[in-house]
Amino acid sequence: MISFLRTTEFDAWLKALRDPIAKARVLARIRSAEAGNPGDCSPVGEGISEMRIHVGPGYRLYYCRRGELTCLLLCAGDKSSQEKDIRTAKALLKNLDSP
């Protein structure tokens, strides 16, 4: 079983998500990924992958692997903010990896 840890940025995004159906789908998708079924995912570069959720405006969760059984949810958004969210995820990862 894989564990997904969350950054404060990811938690803030999830808390601000007003659509209860979308929030439920995001949480269900994380549980599914923890059970080993990540679904529709794709690498976006620099060790970061995008988990796509096909509901509403098309939500995206950005994460990276941390060892064999751990992933870190960096940030999230939707299709309209995809490019900015990828830049944010890369910056967050770079800051986390800095000594």
Q: Each predicted region: which residue ranges?
A:
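Basic, Lys/Arg-enriched alpha-helical interface segments
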Residues: M1-G58, R66-C71, D78-P99
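Basic nucleic-acid-binding interfaces
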Residues: Y63
